[in-house]
Amino acid sequence: MAALSSAAVTIPSMAPSAPGRRRMRSSLVVRASLGKAAGAAAVAVAASAMLAGGAMAQEVLLGANGGVLVFEPNDFTVKSGETITFKNNAGFPHNVVFDEDAVPSGVDVSKISQEEYLNAPGETFSVTLTVPGTYGFYCEPHAGAGMVGKVTVN
């Protein structure tokens, strides 16, 4: 017989609160029907890892809503190990090529670039950058139109 179990995970904030201001607390409550109480602990551990770990992601649109040939955003910062997902926002073919002259020393751009075109709206390419520094990238068919970007990895 399945029992209703729940688990709560609280992620403490390290930022001090301003005098007279109430401090907000981040939390996640997971409820699920689980056969064993140990299942609730597993859910709590997974939720904690998702909130505290590299589950954060940066989404970058390939092409703006108005049809402009840009990366949106085109200049952003991520933490080392954070996933960046590039999403085709229009019907134009786009790709994401990291410029070998604009990445940290030792980074192999062939391993992080998506040279194949994303042709349909909604198609995605994801990459995880781990070496801190600045990475320049561009859309091969639209670089001349200004479709270039920069990501800083901390």
UniProtKB/Swiss-Prot annotation:
Keyword rRNA-binding present in the record's keywords: the answer is no
Q: Which GO terms describe its cellular component?
A: chloroplast thylakoid lumen; chloroplast thylakoid membrane
Transit peptide location:
1-57
Species name for this entry?
Oryza sativa subsp. indica
Q: Where in the cell is it found?
A: Plastid, Chloroplast thylakoid membrane
Instruction: Please report the stretch or stretches of sequence annotated as the Plastocyanin-like domain.
Output: 58-154
Gene3D superfamilies hit by this protein: Cupredoxins - blue copper proteins
The record lists Cu cation as bound by: 94, 139, 142, 147
Which terms are listed as keywords in the entry?
Chloroplast, Copper, Electron transport, Membrane, Metal-binding, Plastid, Thylakoid, Transit peptide, Transport
Q: Per its Swiss-Prot or TrEMBL entry, what cofactor is needed?
A: Cu(2+)
Fetch the InterPro entries from UniProt.
BlueCu_1 (IPR000923), BlueCu_1_BS (IPR028871), Copper_blue_Plastocyanin (IPR001235), Cupredoxin (IPR008972), Plastocyanin (IPR002387)
Task of the protein:
Participates in electron transfer between P700 and the cytochrome b6-f complex in photosystem I.
Pfam families linked to this entry: Copper-bind (PF00127)
* One function term, GO molecular function aspect: electron transporter, transferring electrons from cytochrome b6/f complex of photosystem II activity
Question: What name has this protein been given in UniProt?
Answer: Plastocyanin, chloroplastic
